[in-house]
Amino acid sequence: MSIHISSKFEEAMKELENIVAELESGNVPLERSVELFNKGKELHKYCDKVIKEISLHIESVDPDDKELSAKFSDD
C-alpha cells in the first residue's frame, strides 16, 4: 500500500467526518443535506474498499494469524 493511497484515505475519512458533523448539526437545508449524503456515500464506498484491500493484504502476509484476521472480519 503506497503512501499516496494512505494520505488519500486519511483525507477521505476527514471529509467524511466533516460531512457527518455538518449533517448532525441540524442546520443544513434539505438540498444541501442530499448533496452531503451522496458525497458521504461515495467517500464511505472508497474508504470501505481501501479497508478491505488492507485486510486482504494483512491476511496474505500472515494467513495463519487467526486473531489478526478476526479483527478485520465483517462479523
Swiss-Prot record:
Q: Which InterPro entries does its entry note?
A: Exonuc_VII_S, Exonuc_VII_ssu_sf
According to the UniProt entry, what is the EC number of this protein?
3.1.11.6
A single GO cellular-component term on record: exodeoxyribonuclease VII complex
| Superkingdom per UniProt | Bacteria
Which Gene3D superfamilies does the record cross-reference, listed alphabetically? Answer: Exonuclease VII, small subunit (1.10.287.1040)
Chief subcellular location: cytoplasm
Annotated keywords: Cytoplasm, Exonuclease, Hydrolase, Nuclease
Q: Where in the cell is it found?
A: Cytoplasm
Q: Name one GO biological process term.
A: DNA catabolic process
Reactions that this protein is recorded to catalyse: Exonucleolytic cleavage in either 5'- to 3'- or 3'- to 5'-direction to yield nucleoside 5'-phosphates
Recorded GO molecular functions are: exodeoxyribonuclease VII activity
What general EC class does the enzyme of this chain belong to?
hydrolase
Q: Which family does it belong to?
A: Belongs to the XseB family.
Assembly, in brief, is: Heterooligomer composed of large and small subunits.
Record's function text:
Bidirectionally degrades single-stranded DNA into large acid-insoluble oligonucleotides, which are then degraded further into small acid-soluble oligonucleotides.
**Name this polypeptide is given:** Exodeoxyribonuclease 7 small subunit
